[in-house]
């Protein structure tokens, strides 16, 4: 950038007739362990993603030492993966074995509960809350960018609002943020938004609603109500409100009875008791086993699933809101993952931007880059300007498109030509280069040379 008349380059990249954009930022991931297990991060760089935010939904690998962490931590942690007594220990390991992408880290509330409490089916005691707050403060001092909760899941579902407020009150001093998978995204979604706004207001912290949606046929169309509710509170919430969204009508998480009840279809993504059934419809499995879908689900546990429980009109309405960021919420350890893991960003660019003309190309890129970096405090990321980090994605606006499907969910996208992270090419000619130049994005640090 700037006057390059006297500059020499190590190589030249032909970007004629291509879009040269800041590298995309995936603001909602569960890539904590895969950064170390599969550091080339093909599922991200093939989409043009150069930075990820991990530790979402209350689930982080640290600070926790546990041989067999309980659900939902098993979404990211196999036996032995939770081996970090401090958050800084985890960050140092990632720094010592860089991935192809940059990563910023949230401290998970469920992780704090598992590491602190002797029984999880209750509210935390005052000494336990003090311990969790202290662990959060240690993580924030080490460089975490905020606290995440997954109040929809055990063990956090047992946490009253006051517990979360007390722990989250550590955020303000670090100018960190509160990120939440809310307690409910169906019939009680408005009450859950109110709880979220209260936590942010009393903790004096910005709030980010994870994967905003309305689920269940009875709630189709209620995104009008939820978005108006968010807009109404934006003006009175002095610390900021934002949300992320993925461009699909199906969600994915652990196999839960209440989620099954909301869904028109359920696709099994993994099962520890029956791994051979990953990728199958739950209804077909039930027919094969000679039982109803709930009995079949019980036989598959522990397991995960894709739930078809949203309306396309709601997805489009939420995507169109100016405060929406893009986050994949992909689960990289699933045997048969949701296609969002490989297709989220090209799907926004190709299907929703180019084909449906839901918003301009410039607006689509803003939601994936500069706005996301600003919201999460990622300094000199998400922009193309002199002196900023050289995270760059080059793509063909005419051909970019997701190719991952629910049948073949691990198919790389089309139209992503070249991806650079911190000035190093990590993806070109349809392949990962093997370069691993990613940085750990500690809160307030990582300025370019």
Which residue stretches match the model-derived regions?
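Histidine-rich, glycine-flanked metal-binding segment
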Residues: 1-23, 38
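Short, ordered loop/turn segments at secondary-structure junctions
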Residues: 3-4, 57-58, 152, 182-184, ...
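Di-metal (Zn2+ and/or Mg2+/Mn2+) metal-binding site signature of metallo-dependent hydrolases
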Residues: 19-43
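Flexible loop/turn segments at secondary-structure boundaries
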Residues: 32-33, 59-63, 111-114, 154-158, ...
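Active-site microenvironment of metallo-dependent hydrolases
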Residues: 45, 258-449
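Histidine/acidic residue-rich metal-binding segments in metalloenzymes
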Residues: 89, 123-149, 155-300, 306-325
